[in-house]
Amino acid sequence: GINTKIQLSEEEKIMRRRINEEYMLNGVILENPETITIQKGIRIGRDTVIESNVKILGDTIIGENCLIGMNSRIEDSKIADDVKILSSVIEKAIVEKGADVGPFSRLRPKAHLKERVHIGNFVEVKNAVVGEG
């Protein structure tokens, strides 16, 4: 059993490694996988690159050929193919194909980025649809 916080931490490392190895065997590229937290059951497409210190949580789907940059957090969101997210926080949002986000941006609940939209540095979007302008 687990009786101390140290033992809990060691067990979490073991589980994180097992989960991350499963994603890598299915074609996801994890840079420094020991720093990446992905909850079990999240769908991630082939050839998506996930950099260091990323957390992917909840009811999240990430498409193929994406880049999830270091220090990003994605929760309960839908990310289409060919999306680039750099050091940003995405929560309960939709990002369509070919869009790019950040660095240092935040998509809050009900943010929806249409295809090929660019959201730059330090931008926050909530409850809005952003399309070609």
Task: Put a short name on every predicted segment.
Residues 1-45:
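Conserved alpha/beta core of the MobA/IspD/sugar-nucleotide pyrophosphorylase nucleotidyltransferase superfamily
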Residues 29-133:
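Structural signal for interior beta-strand "rungs" in well-ordered beta-sheet cores
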